């Protein structure tokens, strides 16, 4: 059984790794804390999230760049180069899959079972929804549908907990609404539902803005700005008749909207 001193050491190493931009080691240290099966502090929770976000973020950026180059090569008829890029893209996709599987295991086996506070429960289900969404960004066919279904399920669980436990101005509840709306837009190709969710979250937060404490004011208002930016971007995609637009190939748009940590 690890001692309090061990836990403090893991957290300190994670902070060092973050400053040194060694995010894989940051994740490893915070996984050691998660494996203790204790309720993580807000600081520990954020360290774990930031570590994984950077590890996955680098690969997501690589995948988008490779996909864009691949499309250009295909449009030029450069089949040999397109094949090379496809093979390289699959390597990145394997890394993405492995990271997401690792996140799910930590969340399901350690974080959710150890979560006592409502805020923690929302945070972890939101995180689960995010990483299934990242899988759905590049998976195809049945695997894409399965990842999308699991992402939806996790976001819905997070939303139920958030509405019961957190005020509309809470940054975690706002971040959840932001990311869930991005899921509707990018994965389900539904700008109408994305806008509805984002607008509802924004309006509810605005109506209670005077209750916002100074501590979370900056975080909450930043996410509200992102919600508004996405609404502006997405509104133009809603057809005149109000029906959801379904993109023929079912692939996510690159840069379809901002999401939260």
UniProtKB/Swiss-Prot annotation:
<dbReference type="Pfam" id="PF00244">
    <property type="entry name" value="14-3-3"/>
</dbReference>
<dbReference type="GO" id="GO:0048528">
    <property type="term" value="P:post-embryonic root development"/>
</dbReference>
<dbReference type="InterPro" id="IPR023410">
    <property type="entry name" value="14-3-3_domain"/>
</dbReference>
<dbReference type="InterPro" id="IPR000308">
    <property type="entry name" value="14-3-3"/>
</dbReference>
<dbReference type="InterPro" id="IPR036815">
    <property type="entry name" value="14-3-3_dom_sf"/>
</dbReference>
<feature type="region of interest" description="Disordered">
    <location>
        <begin position="237"/>
        <end position="261"/>
    </location>
</feature>
<protein>
    <recommendedName>
        <fullName>14-3-3-like protein B</fullName>
    </recommendedName>
</protein>
<dbReference type="GO" id="GO:0005509">
    <property type="term" value="F:calcium ion binding"/>
</dbReference>
<comment type="similarity">
    <text>Belongs to the 14-3-3 family.</text>
</comment>
<dbReference type="InterPro" id="IPR023409">
    <property type="entry name" value="14-3-3_CS"/>
</dbReference>
């Amino acid at each position: 059984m690890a001692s309090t001193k061990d836990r403090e050491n893991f957290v300190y190493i994670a902070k060092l790794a973050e400053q040194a931009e060694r995010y894989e080691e940051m994740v490893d240290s915070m996984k050691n804390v998660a494996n203790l099966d204790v309720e993580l502090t807000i600081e520990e929770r954020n360290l774990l999230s930031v570590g994984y976000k950077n590890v996955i973020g680098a690969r997501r950026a690589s995948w988008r760049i490779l996909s864009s180059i691949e499309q250009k090569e295909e449009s030029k008829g450069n089949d040999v180069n397109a094949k090379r890029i496809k093979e390289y893209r699959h390597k990145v996709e394997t890394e993405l899959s492995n990271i997401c599987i690792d996140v799910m295991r930590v969340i399901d086996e350690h974080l959710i079972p150890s979560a006592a506070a409502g805020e923690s429960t929302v945070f972890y289900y939101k995180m689960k929804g995010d990483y299934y969404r990242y899988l759905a960004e590049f998976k195809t066919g049945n695997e894409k549908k399965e990842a999308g279904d699991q992402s939806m399920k996790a976001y819905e669980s997070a939303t139920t907990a958030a509405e019961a436990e957190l005020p509309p101005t809470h940054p975690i509840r706002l971040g959840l609404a932001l990311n869930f709306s991005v899921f509707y837009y990018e994965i389900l190709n539904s700008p109408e539902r994305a806008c509805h969710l984002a607008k509802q979250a924004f309006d509810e937060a605005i109506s209670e803005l005077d209750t916002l404490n100074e501590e979370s004011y900056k975080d909450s208002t930043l996410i509200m700005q992102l919600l508004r930016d996405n609404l502006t971007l997405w509104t133009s995609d809603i057809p005149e008749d109000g029906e959801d637009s379904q993109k023929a190939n079912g692939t996510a748009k690159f840069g379809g909207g901002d999401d939260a940590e």
